[in-house]
């Protein structure tokens, strides 16, 4: 299956879920750009509204857990904080093959929803404190969703974990 076809399956699944749950959202089709700054400008949203999705692997202390870690696009992740919260000793970004297997998306197109039973969903709360809408790529690099923050929290139900880097 091509990258586009795989991402399309995730996109359709996401849109079906949001529609079924009565979410207040809109889909924006745009040029496929990889940088958070560029895509937020195209979407007409603030960088801090962007939900950056990192597929991580937490290991150590008997823990071997894949995590979909969501944070505001204007923040940096502190992977050691994330590992500590999950109960592991270290966290690293997953390989492209693991990202593909767990999300069906290419890096940069991953929505902040886990559709895989082995992918634990956590989110840094700052993403939800500053804006009443969040924005994210929706399985494909050329499609974004802008979604009411309250609907995201209600539907996705992420575990809220402070793991952003602080000065």
UniProtKB/Swiss-Prot annotation:
Membrane-crossing segments per the record: none
EC number: 3.1.1.-
GO terms, biological process: aminoacyl-tRNA metabolism involved in translational fidelity; positive regulation of translational fidelity
InterPro entries: PROXY (IPR044786), YbaK/aa-tRNA-synt-asso_dom_sf (IPR036754), YbaK/aa-tRNA-synth-assoc-dom (IPR007214)
Entry's Gene Ontology cellular component terms: cytoplasm
Role noted for this protein: An aminoacyl-tRNA editing enzyme that deacylates Ser-tRNA and/or Thr-tRNA mischarged by lysyl-tRNA synthetase (LysRS), threonyl-tRNA synthetase (ThrRS), seryl-tRNA synthetase (SerRS), alanyl-tRNA synthetase (AlaRS), valyl-tRNA synthetase (ValRS) and isoleucyl-tRNA synthetase (IleRS) in vitro. Also deacylates mischarged Hse-tRNA(Lys) and Hse-tRNA(Ser), and cognate Ser-tRNA(Ser) and Thr-tRNA(Thr) in vitro. The presence of cognate ThrRS abolishes the Thr-tRNA(Thr) deacylase activity, hence this activity is not applicable physiologically.
Record protein name field: Multifunctional Ser/Thr-tRNA deacylase ProXp-y
Organism of derivation: Escherichia coli (strain K12)
Highest classification ranks of the organism: Bacteria, Pseudomonadati, Pseudomonadota, Gammaproteobacteria, Enterobacterales
The gene coding this protein: proXp-y
């Amino acid at each position: 299956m091509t990258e586009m076809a795989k991402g399309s399956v995730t996109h359709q699944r996401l849109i079906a879920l949001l529609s079924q749950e009565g979410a207040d959202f809109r889909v924006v089709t745009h040029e496929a750009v990889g940088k958070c700054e560029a895509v937020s400008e195209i979407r007409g949203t603030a960088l801090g509204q962007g939900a950056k999705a990192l597929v991580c692997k937490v290991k150590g202390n008997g823990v071997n857990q894949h995590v979909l870690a969501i944070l505001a696009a204007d923040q940096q992740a502190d992977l050691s904080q994330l590992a500590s919260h999950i109960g592991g000793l270290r966290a690293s970004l997953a390989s492209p093959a693991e990202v593909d297997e767990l999300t069906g998306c290419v890096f940069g197109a991953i929505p902040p929803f886990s559709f895989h039973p082995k992918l634990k969903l956590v989110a840094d709360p700052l993403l939800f404190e500053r804006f009443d809408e969040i924005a994210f790529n929706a399985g494909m690099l050329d499609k974004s969703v802008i979604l009411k923050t309250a609907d995201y929290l209600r539907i996705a139900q992420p575990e809220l974990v402070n793991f952003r880097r602080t000065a």
